[in-house]
Amino acid sequence: MRTLGGFTFPCDAPVFVRVDFNVPMDEVGTITDDLRIRASLPTIESLLGRGAPLILISHLGRPVKNEQQGFSLKPCAERLSEYIGVNVPLVDFLDLDTKLYGELTRHLDKSGIVLFENIRFFAEETSKAQADRRILAEQLAPFAGAYVNDAFGASHRRHASVYELAQAFSNKAAGFLIESEMQAFSHLASEAKRPYTVILGGAKLSDKLRLIENILPTVDRLLLCGGMAFTFLAAQGCETGKSLLEESFISEANKIIDFAKQNNVELILPVDVIEARSLTSPLGVVSKAESISYMGLDIGPETQSIFRNVIQDSKTVFWNGPAGLFENPSFSNGTRALLDALSSSSAFTFIGGGDTAAAVSLLGFDYGDFSHVSTGGGACLELLEGKILPALEVL
């Protein structure tokens, strides 16, 4: 995979930079967490500093046909403008014709950078038919002379702007964000100091099964929390009440428990939980994990203490998936306790994107408190499952 260090520019031709500005916004369109925009700055500023005219491409959310309201990248263009000190025009390019060349030229002559409107406004971007995606890529390709992918969070997709468009260029490279992400994953794969602890939470075991199978032989401790823990508790004969439970995966949970025992991997489950009658309950009660009556929505204080001690005794920690329903303050203490333990740890601490990265900001922590916070949710998991990311394979 070629990186920006070996990247050469075409004479005067713009460079496509596929960024990932898929950031969370509130109901009035205000960005609530701009990690992904800030993470793109090293690549953008480096290319601008080297005199390259830039055409940025990104997606935002999952707009459906003829439903564009709430999915405009305008707030992202405005936030990026604040960071780089240059006005970043937002260009609506739904009509890919010769008129666009003139508009792009005017903007690039003035600012040196533009942001195309949400690429997912084209249905072809996410089409399952490769022929459709290739048509969109062929329409886009003439507007630039080179291609840089810095959208790690979208690189597990076979979408037109990260897969087919990259194949349209011989002069292409990965940006600094992707390079940084891959270095962090390389550290986990080949340089992880021991004890090596993995914490997995989130809703479903089925979403993390392949990940667990791939990493279990390489770790010393596996801490399980979130909704997926209840399938493991049920496998051990515990009463899980109305908690999230995947009964069809209980046998898989038993296999994982047996494998951990046979390979001296310490598998640690919650010993107490915070349970409540509903997801919106204003208050939960502490219960032993083996006898839950209602819904387990967070790990309890004893489990928090156990997990904290394990983290303090670790040299490498990877965490993906919140410990509970952290969006509700009543059930955020478990996730907060893990963040607090990790932020004060001397270990290499890796936060695995998605909801886990969102919790960092929401619960008042700083991304700099951790060794690495990934910008990719699905991309992060697929790498740890041992998969090759399609968009990186074609660079």
From Swiss-Prot:
Catalytic activity, reaction form: (2R)-3-phosphoglycerate + ATP = (2R)-3-phospho-glyceroyl phosphate + ADP
Entry GO terms, CC: cytosol
Protein EC: 2.7.2.3
Disulfide linkage: none
Binding site for ATP: K208, G296, E327, G353, G354, D355, T356
Binding site for substrate: D20, F21, N22, R36, H59, L60, G61, R62, R120, R157
Assigned keywords, A-Z: ATP-binding, Cytoplasm, Glycolysis, Kinase, Nucleotide-binding, Transferase
GO terms assigned for molecular function: ADP binding; ATP binding; phosphoglycerate kinase activity
Localization terms from the record: Cytoplasm
Assembly notes: Monomer.
PANTHER family: PHOSPHOGLYCERATE KINASE (PTHR11406), PHOSPHOGLYCERATE KINASE 1, CHLOROPLASTIC-RELATED (PTHR11406:SF23)
UniProt-recorded name of the protein: Phosphoglycerate kinase
Organism: Tropheryma whipplei (strain TW08/27)
Gene: pgk
